[in-house]
Structure formats: structure tokens, C-alpha cells
């Protein structure tokens, strides 16, 4: 299992700093992750409420997650001109890229907004109800994300500006972060993020397998918006065979109706022309 885990995540990023516990969901399995663990596409991280974890990428980009943050490496591009994507479901995060390759960009998805950045440094606080982003330096593009995953008009923000999106309201752009944002921000976010990757070039750690994911482990992700939870049905379908996982899926089906076809496949079977129930095939209750 350890060999499979490391092969899964060869090039995307490395955990270079860990304070407190870090849970890693890879595939449908939960691991404990430590400094030196390599990360790959699809990896989901949950950070200790009192801790932090820093990910450094091969192109020099750095992402620090703090105070219970939950994030997923959705797609990490390998080429210099590619666009990498990271979902931050909740909590605090600071990202920076001092010298991005020509055309290289990172897109950060939150439940309420999307930010695309090249050479920029920013701090964000994300939750289901709101997203706040302080652009420390550089420039970014941002847009609102609706409950159904629809992207709004793309707007620009530059160093010093503060983006706030609450609920379904239109995002506001202010000249400085709010006092409350600064007060609640993790203290180490006031400083530049340290560059630690070179120290770990010859160090490789393997995540420790804990257990197959429970519904509680992934509940918040399964209930996220369409732009964040795509591919989750295929990824976690194997866990629907577990009786408790299945029970919770059914109990919360309204929050993730895309699971209906997995849970009740008979509703979607094609009926023969002589089947008295053929007129009801494919209906969804």
C-alpha cells in the first residue's frame, strides 16, 4: 500500500511543514501525513484546528493551510504554461508564487468564489457562507461561484485590495482588509512563507494508512458545490457498499442527489416494452 501511495503522488507537491495532525485522503482511504510526504492530484488534506501544513510545488508556488483548513489538489499542471487547480473548502490559506513560469497560473476554488493568480501573494478565509481574500501583492482575477456552480463575471484585484463574498450576494472589493479579518488571521500569515523544499530533496516520507474513509470523513466534500465535488461519485462509489456509509448517503441524499443512481440503480434500468413499469423507468423520486 505504501508503494502505491507514493506512486500516486510523484510530482505535484511536497508537505514541507507540518504542525499538529494532518489527515490525507487518497482515493477512498484516509492516511496520516507528515513532513516529506509527496502529494498528487485528488489528494484531500484536513489540517489540525491548532496546526498548519505547508505544500511546496515544483514551480516554486507555496500554499500554507491553517486552523482546520480543508483543501484538495484538484489538478496540478506539469507544464510551465499549465493551470493548476486547488479547492479550499474551508479554513485559512495563504498562497504565494514569486516567480511563476511564463503563463503558469493557479486557480483556487472556494464554495463562494474562484481566484486565479500568477505572481501573487494572498490570504483567504473560506467557508460555506462566505469567502474573504486579501491580496497582499501582485494581481489576481476573481469571480463569484453560485450554488449551482455557475461562474460569474471575472473581475480584477490588485495588491492591497480585499474581496468579500457573503452568501449569494455580489462580491465587494475594498481598499484594505477588515479589522476582523486581520484579527482572526493566523499570526504566521503576517510573514513571508518560508521556502523549505530544498531541505527535503533527499527526504521522502510515506503516509500512514489509517482506515477506509467514513461518511463523516468526506461529508463536507460530498455536500460541496458542483465545481468542487465533481468526480466524487466515481471516486467514493466503492464505499457505498459499506452499510453505514450507504445509510448516511441515503439520509442526506437531498444534499448530493447525484448519488441516487448508485444507490438505486433499479430506478434507471431500461424496461422492456411489455413491462408494465416501463413508463416509470428512469424517474427519480
Question: Which residues are covered by each model-predicted region?
Answer:
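Flexible, surface-exposed loop/linker segments and immediately adjacent secondary-structure boundaries
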Residues: 9-261, 265, 269
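Extended, charge-rich intrinsically disordered regulatory tails
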Residues: 276-281
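Charge-dense, extended regions
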Residues: 283-285
